Amino acid sequence: PIGDEKAEEGTVSLALGLGKYIVDGGLTLRVCPYHPNQVLQTSEMEIALRETQTQFYALDLKNTGHNFSLDDGFNLLKLPVKEADNDGALTFIASTYDPYDMIIRDGIYPGGRKVITFANVLQHDVFPLPRILQLVQEYGQSEMRRPVEIEFAVTLNQQKKNGTFYLLQIRPMVDVKANLEEDLNLIKDEDVLLKSNNSLGHGIMEDIQDVIYVKTDGYTASN
């Protein structure tokens, strides 16, 4: 954590384009949703030019599926950030480096390298992403009773100057003490209290008082 940030407030990895870029370990913008003005990667010009996103993934709209593959990236294009400026995708998330004045200006201006800073979203409230993430984290942790990990997407409308937030996944984070070392295949069925083919993962919950088992045979919600 930086400055007055707290570990429990979490961090977010932001990137232009499809999420595969983040999954593959691409250079993302890391920020705490409770402190959107404190972004280490954009705190100095040299750091911003060196430590921000330079490429992104986009769908290859010319690929009609003739070379369909199990590779999840077969119909994706990896493009330089400047390519996204052609369709207005950078309007609210990029800044412009001015090599003459040696400064990075929030927003899109002619010429100059485009730097993915999300400044208009994080600092100028074009879209309330930090607040939305705070609420998702708050409600998610309250319901799951532990820190959560989320995946999300946002589309920003340049003409209407608004956007849509999509919550793609939310799951509990398993801490170190919940690591499972037991080989479940070695446990006999007669020694098992409950067994399921579907689960959200393993963990330790120390506040459980009761376990209710519902027989699904003949059960209806009206009962």
Language-model region placement:
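Conserved mixed alpha/beta core segments that line enzyme active sites in large multi-domain catalysts
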Residues: P1-N223
